[in-house]
A protein has these predicted regions:
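S/T-rich, low-complexity, solvent-exposed segments of bacterial secretion/appendage proteins
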Residues: 1-658
Length: 658
């Protein structure tokens, strides 16, 4: 009996000692990040006493998984918000607001219209346009600087991420070795591994699981592996010839690489990539669409007037080249494809990417795809051999507002894919083509006069100038009207008139006129002429009105007023003015920032609650450990008394035997 009592007391001592050690371990690691409270389990022995079992970690894998998921979500929105809030504060700053520079430029045009002969006012208007161009560059620089910051942060994050996965893999090896030579679990190593997994979730949305050996494996939310037992993978940035500005990721397995879907990555890496692909691309293309619309509208209108030297106006702005991309094996073919915005057709240009490919021997197709790669419209199919080319080899795709030149058309094979985005980088490439204010075409290219012998008070006025191209209008290359063009309007009655050329030959006759605006349109001649005229009231029989290029005054501001009025025209996508479009863009940035900020705040609350749930189970409580320590100390003392009693009993028995 005494020997049994001795065994019971000894096992109690061992049990109490082990639990005191566990309590001491918990207490000493109260501030250790990632440490999970440990507990030494025991069971009653069938022969008496207590049997020590494992010292295990108090963890709930479901709660730990939730902590990682919520950490990833918060990190995603926090990173996204930090980037977009910077963009919001910069783009919305009044001192660099594009609308301020737009208003200043058009105000300067209005001012010079008051005195078109003033060189100083012309130069002031030219300086305002130059400032506007520089502001496009500034705003584009804000976007590109943020893109550079994303690239730098992403490179750093991937380096840290790959280091973490390597450490997790290394810990798997250590755990396998340590638990193979011991009956106790490698608690501290597993705590380190859990902490690394939590750190990893700050970068990506991951799933941590344990295989049949009890080793941690890491997968992305889409199922792609990052850690397989003792074999880590590596995440890398990969170049994409079709989308050079797009961030592509690959998972390297050492001997081969697999492309990674970048949607829904979560964590800070997902936040950086989504900011770049969603907001940064959108901002760059929005500014580019804005710049294209401004340049095209101003250039088109300036070509309809005469500059200070009496010459037809030329382009005020210049646009950069539109880059054409293709797959790596087709890069040489892409160099033979040129694309530009058709003159006067910028309203048709969208922020989409355009995909060109050859469908068969003769036909090509172009379709528009959005930033997500989804088609946004029906594909346009055309046969280049049937389209008329200009002197530079370009043919028009009217539906898209684009001119295309295919120099190496015979080299292009069926199903070759080429992509280009007209608005990409267009704001950064915008330039001022005119050298000074004298290039601003304020005057109309044609004058009108009312016959001195007319019997009525009706006065003729120039209504519009729509085309000055010598090949398609009444204007010759030297600026004069072709002799065959409309030169005179003669009223045969108050309600009928004829249009005559310079030789008096009748070009058209119109009768039953009750409204006297756009007389050439009524005669069916306005499109060919490229201009139109109106009279102020009902003429009388015999009234004559003339048009020609010798009736232009130096102070004429007809085209200058049209240039200034572009501020009020719906130039962006044919739906919004320049100012309204940029204001809408700033509103979008503000609302997007507020939306992301709301998600960041709410996800932080959810994450903190998950961490608190984990801590309630796994974190060390000094109060609880103090109670346990007192209890185990008392248990140790009691077990020692049992051993003492067993020894006393044994000695008493020996004494009796003597």
């Amino acid at each position: 009996m005494s020997s049994n009592l001795y065994s019971i007391g000894l096992s109690g001592l061992q049990s109490s000692n082990a639990r005191i050690n566990t309590t001491g371990q918990n207490t000493s690691n109260v501030d250790t990040e990632g440490y999970s409270r440990q507990r030494t389990d025991t069971t009653s022995s069938p022969v008496g006493g207590v049997v020590l079992r494992d010292t295990s970690r108090l963890v709930d894998n479901f709660v730990s998984s939730q902590v990682r998921s919520d950490t990833s979500t918060f990190s995603y929105y926090d990173t996204y918000h930090s980037m977009i809030s910077t963009s919001d504060s910069l783009l919305a700053e009044d001192s660099i607001s594009l609308n301020t520079y737009i208003n200043n430029s058009f105000d300067a045009l209005q001012t010079v219209n008051n005195d078109p002969t003033s060189s100083s006012l012309r130069q002031l208007a030219h300086s305002s346009l130059n400032n506007l161009v520089q502001q496009y560059h500034t705003l584009s620089g804000v976007v590109s600087d943020q893109e550079g910051l994303v690239d730098a942060q992403l490179a750093s994050s991937l380096g840290d991420l790959n280091t973490i996965t390597a450490k997790i893999s290394n810990l798997n090896e250590q755990i396998l070795r340590q638990e193979g030579i011991s009956i106790s679990p490698a608690n501290e190593l597993r705590d380190q591994q859990e902490l690394l997994a939590k750190d990893l979730s700050k970068y990506l949305d991951i799933k941590a699981q344990f295989n049949d050996k009890g080793l941690m494996t890491i997968q992305l939310a889409n199922g792609q592996p990052l850690v397989m037992d003792q074999f880590p993978t590596e995440l890398k940035v990969s170049s994409n010839p079709l989308h050079p500005k797009k961030i592509d990721l690959v998972v390297s397995f050492g001997d081969y690489e697999v492309g990674l879907k970048t949607q829904g990555l979560g964590g800070s890496v997902g936040g950086l990539i989504d900011y770049r692909s969603e907001f940064s691309v959108y901002a760059d293309r929005t500014l580019g669409q804005h710049a294209i619309a401004l340049a095209d509208a101003m250039n088109t209108q300036n070509r309809k007037g005469l500059d200070a030297d009496g010459q037809f106006g030329k382009d005020l702005f210049s646009l950069g080249d539109i880059n054409v991309y293709s797959t790596a094996d087709n890069l040489n073919k892409a160099k033979d494809i040129s694309v530009r915005v058709s003159a006067g057709q910028s309203a048709k240009i969208t922020k989409d990417t355009y995909e060109l490919n050859r469908t068969d021997d003769n036909l090509f197709s172009i379709k528009k795809v959005n930033a997500e790669g989804k088609s946004t419209d029906k594909a346009i199919t055309f046969d280049p051999s049937l389209l008329q080319k200009d002197n530079n080899g370009y043919f028009k795709i009217d539906e898209l507002g684009l001119d295309i030149r295919l120099d190496g058309i015979d080299k292009i094979d069926k199903d070759d894919i080429f992509q280009f985005t007209p608005t990409e980088g267009a704001a950064a490439a915008l330039g001022l083509a005119s050298r000074n204010g004298e290039a601003i075409a304020l005057s109309a290219p044609i004058g009108v006069s009312t016959g001195s012998d007319n019997l009525s008070d009706a006065r003729i006025s120039l209504t519009s100038v729509t085309n000055t191209d010598p090949e398609t209008s009444a204007f010759s290359s030297d600026g004069s009207l072709y002799p065959s063009a409309p030169h005179k309007i003669y009223f045969t009655s108050p309600s009928s008139y004829v249009v005559q050329n310079s030789s008096g030959v009748e070009l058209a006759k119109v009768e039953n006129v009750i409204e006297f605006s756009n007389l050439l349109e009524k005669a069916g001649l306005s499109n060919e002429a490229g201009f139109d005229v109106s009279v102020s009231s009902m003429p009388k029989r015999g009234d004559e009105f003339s048009v020609g290029t010798d009736n232009i005054g130096q102070s004429d501001n007809f085209n200058g007023l049209a240039l200034a009025d572009l501020q009020n025209q719906s130039l962006i996508d044919g739906k919004a003015t320049l100012v309204k479009s940029f204001s809408g863009f700033i509103s979008y940035v503000g609302s997007k920032t507020a939306e992301i900020e709301g998600h960041a705040d709410s996800s932080e609350i959810v994450m903190n609650e998950s961490i608190a749930r984990r801590d309630r189970l796994s974190a060390v409580s000094l109060d609880e450990e103090a109670v346990n320590l007192l209890k185990y100390q008392q248990s140790y003392s009691a077990s020692a008394q049992v051993v003492t009693a067993a020894r006393t009993t044994f000695e008493t028995l020996l004494g009796i035997m003597r």
